[in-house]
Each structure stands twice: as structure tokens, then as C-alpha cells.
Amino acid sequence: MARELIMVMRVADYIMQRLVQAGVAHVFQVTGRGTLFLSDALAKIEDLQAVSLHHEQSCSFAAVAYAEKQRGLGACLVSTGCASTNTITGVLTAWQDGVSCIFISGQNILRETTRHTGIALRTYGQQEADIVSLVTPITKYAHMLQRAQDIVEVMD
């Protein structure tokens, strides 16, 4: 049923609905080009409140503090490249302290990422960074979504 449902809705909407199902009530965010659809989906869900901050590191620390205080899941939404790398200290804090958080980073169009060009470049797309490689050692799970139909499995 979920796989059928995902074909008629945006991935961004599905992600936000899953956050609500996981008990998330607040998402700490800095909007950007890479999160356009995610920010739109967040704004449309009545059960989620967007908390906009001025820096990605603030968002990551806010998500960690919120999760600790609420004894639940903290959520952070940031854009691509430098925006995602700005969250790494908060990600590490969550990892070291065993705090449950989800850090969602926007991404460029797949054909504009170093993973898909086949060219040995440090960056290819606008504000791109291979955030998955950077955070894999300090997370339980890090993934770059490459096919919309994989979102159900990724969010599980």
C-alpha cells in the first residue's frame, strides 16, 4: 500500500508525513534552493512546525537539544553543500551523546552530483558536497536518495 501511495505524492510530502508519524512536532531549518520542495511540504503539514534559524549549526544543535528535552526525535532540515557541512558538529554531538535525531539535507539534481558524473571532481553541482561520505562514520545511517520509489525503505 505504501509503495502505491508514494507514486501519487511527492517524496517531500511523504518525508514530512513520516516525521509526524515518528512523533516529530518541530523541524529546525534553514531554507535554501536544495530544500525548496521539502520546505514547501513542511509548511503544508499542520502537525509540524517549522522553526527557522539563521545558521545550519544552530539548527543541528537545536534539534539535538529538543530531542534531549522532549525525549523524542529531533529533526533538522538544511540545504546542500556548505549548508549540510555546517551541521556536522551537531550531528557528532547527537552521535556521541546517543541522541535520536534525523538530519535531512537537500540535494542537487542527480546529474549535477559528483557521484553521478563519473568525473573525479571535488564538486560538480551548485553548492554540492558528498555529505554521505562525510557523516557515515558519525551516524547510524546516511543515505543519498537516488530513486523516488526507494523513499519508503529509506525512511523505515
Segments predicted by a language model, with ranges:
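N-terminal alpha/beta PP-like core and its mobile active-site loop of ThDP/TPP-dependent enzymes
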Residues: 2-156
